[in-house]
Amino acid sequence: MLGKKLHVKKNDTVVVIAGKDRSKSGKVISIHPKKDGVIVEGVNVVKRHQKPRGSEQGGILEKEAPVHISNVMLLCGKCNKPVRTKTTVLEDGKKARCCVKCGESFDK
């Protein structure tokens, strides 16, 4: 079974467009296609109460929780705005994601 096609990839810079962390931006740490979620650095930080196990120390840890994929947009480096993407075919035949507004390529 093939996974879902998502508009963001790991290490992309995204902006949150809805929710309590609206207008915050950060780098995508990981993607969860089955749950339609992305974990963004410094966004949606929650406190987790960790019990001590073995050599690990317990306590209250802060970590990022997933944000739904529909609540993030890719940040264009040239426009410096959240943008939609389109897929274009490059000269060498490879597909790349590009900004709809300015045409800047996100894939290197």
From Swiss-Prot:
Superkingdom of this protein's organism: Bacteria
Pfam name, any one: KOW
GO MF terms, alphabetically ordered: rRNA binding; structural constituent of ribosome
InterPro entries in UniProt: KOW (IPR005824), Rib_uL2_dom2 (IPR014722), Ribosomal_uL24 (IPR003256), Ribosomal_uL24_KOW (IPR041988), Translation_prot_SH3-like_sf (IPR008991)
Entry's Gene Ontology cellular component terms: ribonucleoprotein complex; ribosome
SUPFAM superfamilies: Translation proteins SH3-like domain
SMART domains xref list: KOW
Coiled coil: none
Family: Belongs to the universal ribosomal protein uL24 family.
Protein name: Large ribosomal subunit protein uL24
Gene that specifies this protein: rplX
